[in-house]
């Protein structure tokens, strides 16, 4: 597959450095019902579109919110096209290849992530699935809060009690994004889907939110309503969420009992989908030649976060990650051992995440993470394209976080190198591990890592 849409958008992101999304610091990431699983009715995006609500053409300055949120979503957010894309030739071909009884724009497996796919009994009279990934797909069915959220005494806490999804909580937001961009038990993304022709899927939550683009502004009023924010937390919680979803899917017995092979979607795509003529296996890799490896790109990032923000847990997490890889690549590997290793790591990461959520991502913490991400090139951690792609987005996000903290020197040094790194990621099939790592090693000296 040639450069995907994300790669093509990276240049746009580089021009907007310093404007990425900032979300409120989480409490402990309390469990929250996903919008598509809510018991409440979805009333339809049209109810948000009035110019006196969120459909203003221009931003309003005299109100607590911009009031042009719907307009920004409609004009600029790719999520508006999520349903429409199901009608194009590629989507219809995927549905045919999968042997679906319905066309893509009617099949549940497609609609689950390409629309706000709720049961008919939960659809209000003005609900329209063709709106794609609409307001209620992210903010939750509005049946109980659409009237009360504009009342003078309304509060964010009360709105959440009424069914508003807490997108201002970094981990809750990240779990929502990754439920489709990684997959979860309710919306699994399988190797069958990919094999039928679906483009490769990847995500780094903070980067994707910056590209979305944001339809709100973090200002004094926002903070007053939703609480203080921490610039680096959305990136960190995004990595924890991606890792959690991956581990949950690995441990899902319903997904790993379909023949002699496990669900291949959890593995690094390029371990198999690499040209036969490409002979770049390195003895430094933590696997033998010919072995498929679980896609650990987010786990690599999480370990860097833990080393900086919760170092007391670093050794234990590192051992558990290694145990997962050993279980999945052992000649005597079996599903039960892999699932056990995934469950143990998942439980421990959930505990550590709650610790990390309480740690302020200061300039010192972010700088330590950045240098660690750069240093990992020397240890061959970015041997696979997925790891390199995640490193690129993460280094950019953390550098932007440093800029917001006032450390413009390191941020400018990093940003001056990003174009060259991006070029090395423009074609996943032609990824040059040594060239990418060489660029990062040059950056290592520049930032004093």
Language model features with spans:
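Sec/Tat signal peptide C-region and signal peptidase I cleavage site
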Residues: 27-31
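Primarily the internal scaffold of c-type cytochrome electron-transfer domains
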Residues: 33-36, 57-96, 125-133, 141-388
């Amino acid at each position: 597959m040639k450069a995907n849409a994300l790669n093509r958008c990276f240049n746009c992101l580089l021009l907007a450095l310093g404007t990425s999304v900032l979300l409120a610091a989480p409490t402990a990431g309390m469990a929250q019902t996903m919008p598509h699983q809510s018991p409440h009715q979805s009333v339809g995006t049209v109810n948000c579109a009035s110019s006196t609500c969120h459909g203003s053409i221009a931003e309003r300055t005299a109100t607590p919110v911009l009031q042009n949120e719907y307009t920004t979503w409609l004009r600029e957010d790719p999520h508006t096209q999520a349903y429409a894309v199901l009608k194009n030739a590629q989507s219809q071909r995927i549905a045919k290849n999968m042997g679906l009884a319905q066309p893509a724009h009617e099949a549940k497996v497609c609609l689950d992530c390409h629309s706000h796919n709720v049961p008919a009994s939960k659809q209000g009279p003005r609900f329209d699935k063709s709106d794609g990934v609409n307001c209620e797909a992210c903010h939750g069915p509005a049946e109980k809060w659409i009237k009360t959220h504009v009342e003078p005494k309304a509060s964010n806490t009360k709105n959440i009690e009424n069914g508003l999804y807490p997108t201002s909580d970094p981990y809750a937001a990240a779990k929502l994004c990754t439920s489709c961009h990684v997959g979860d038990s309710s919306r699994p993304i399988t190797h069958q889907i990919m094999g039928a022709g679906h483009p490769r899927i990847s995500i780094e939550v903070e980067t994707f939110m910056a590209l979305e683009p944001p339809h709100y502004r973090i200002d004094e009023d926002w903070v007053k309503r939703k609480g203080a924010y921490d610039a680096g937390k959305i990136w960190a919680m995004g990595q924890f969420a991606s890792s959690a979803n991956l581990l949950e899917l690995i441990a899902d017995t319903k997904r790993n009992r379909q023949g002699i092979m496990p669900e291949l979607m959890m593995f690094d795509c390029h371990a198999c989908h690499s040209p036969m003529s490409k002979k770049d296996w390195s003895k430094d890799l933590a696997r033998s030649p010919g072995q498929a490896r679980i896609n650990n790109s987010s786990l690599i990032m999480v370990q860097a976060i833990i080393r900086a923000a919760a170092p007391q847990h670093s050794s234990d997490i590192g051992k558990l990650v290694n145990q997962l890889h050993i279980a999945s690549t052992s000649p005597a590997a079996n599903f039960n051992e892999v699932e056990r290793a995934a469950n143990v790591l998942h439980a421990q990461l959930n505990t550590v995440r709650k610790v990390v959520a309480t740690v302020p991502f200061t300039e010192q913490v972010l700088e330590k993470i950045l240098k660690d991400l750069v240093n990992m090139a020397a240890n061959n951690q970015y041997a696979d394209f997925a790891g390199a792609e995640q490193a690129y987005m993460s280094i950019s996000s953390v550098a932007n976080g440093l800029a917001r903290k006032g450390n413009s020197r390191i941020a400018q040094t990093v940003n001056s190198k990003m174009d060259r790194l991006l070029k090395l990621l423009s074609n996943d099939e032609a990824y040059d591990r040594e060239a990418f790592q060489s660029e990062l090693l040059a950056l290592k000296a520049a930032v004093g890592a």
